């Protein structure tokens, strides 16, 4: 009954019907599994990440910048601790939605810590955080795979070539649960391509509201002038991992009520989902912490880890992630 009402009859905000959750749920779960497989294959932990950042030296920072780095990492650790507790639950659908939110905000906090450590920069909105992390970290080769995956442009003919290179010949599909690295390459490439397509569409919709487009006197991008205007905008827009994470969080927050929570087969599809989110966030936090340690210096870092483990009110230990 509820499916027919929401999906077929619609709601106040979507009178033509909400999008059906059937297609989106497997791809949502499978992307996270693919990330976990690829991160584990890379062997990301604090030790390997610290070695990876061996050429990064301590940076002189204002104390408020140091405090921002530490604050954002602490927030990320708190979100990881929430996911750690969710792993002990018996019904994945009970915490899948809030789990996605904990996962995303943990990623965003860790990303903010990295950009603050790198350049003293900080953004308080989702789009700004994603843009800054891609600009300051990923585009400079300072992220470990699979978090380094990005496209340099939202022009389709450009990003498709870049996605295919990352796919590396894999036949893996986003709709199929990955079990090997080869499967995971294809699934992760599928989500990257889909995200690029979605951000390109969003850019087009935003452009339609701008004066430059309205002055063309058209309502689509079929004309040469409109396509040129669009491509100039798309060409200047890269997209990285935190962009993908922000889109992912949006699905859980805004898609529709049935997503992650309705249907007899949902619990089966969600099997292992929270464990995957926990594993991926743990790897990202380990990477971010290793980067921050190099920039802050070992003395302040050791003091931070010791203080957190002495005074934190939640469960997960900083020393288990960052030592």
State the predicted function of each range.
Residues 1-323:
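Terminal alpha-helical segments
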């Amino acid at each position: 009954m509820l499916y027919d009402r929401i999906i077929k009859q619609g709601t106040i905000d979507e009178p033509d019907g909400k999008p059906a959750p059937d297609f989106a749920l497997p791809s949502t779960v499978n992307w996270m599994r693919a990330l976990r497989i690829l991160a584990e294959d890379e062997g990301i932990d604090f030790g390997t990440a610290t070695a990876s950042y061996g050429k990064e030296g301590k940076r002189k920072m204002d104390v408020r910048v140091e405090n921002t780095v530490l604050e954002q990492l602490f927030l990320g650790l708190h979100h990881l601790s929430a996911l750690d507790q969710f792993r002990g639950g018996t019904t994945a659908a009970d915490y899948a939605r809030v789990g996605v939110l904990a996962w995303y905000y943990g990623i965003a906090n860790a990303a903010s810590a990295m950009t603050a450590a790198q350049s003293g920069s900080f953004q308080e909105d989702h789009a700004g955080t994603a843009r800054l992390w891609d600009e300051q970290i990923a585009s400079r080769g300072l992220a470990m795979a699979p978090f380094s995956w990005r496209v340099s442009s939202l022009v389709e003919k450009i990003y498709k070539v870049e996605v295919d290179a990352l796919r590396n010949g894999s036949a893996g599909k986003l709709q199929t649960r990955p079990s090997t690295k080869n499967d995971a390459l294809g699934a992760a490439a599928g989500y990257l391509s889909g995200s690029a397509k979605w951000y390109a569409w969003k850019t087009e919709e935003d452009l339609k509201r701008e004066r430059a487009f309205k002055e063309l006197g058209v309502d689509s991008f079929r004309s040469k002038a409109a396509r040129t205007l669009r491509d100039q905008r798309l060409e200047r827009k890269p997209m990285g991992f935190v962009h993908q994470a922000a889109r992912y969080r949006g699905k859980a927050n805004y898609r529709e009520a049935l997503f992650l929570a309705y249907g007899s087969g949902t619990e089966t599809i969600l099997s292992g989902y929270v464990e995957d989110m926990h594993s991926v966030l743990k790897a990202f936090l380990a990477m971010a912490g290793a980067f921050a340690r190099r920039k802050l210096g070992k003395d302040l870092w050791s003091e931070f880890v010791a203080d957190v483990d002495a005074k934190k009110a939640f469960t997960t230990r900083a020393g288990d992630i960052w030592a």
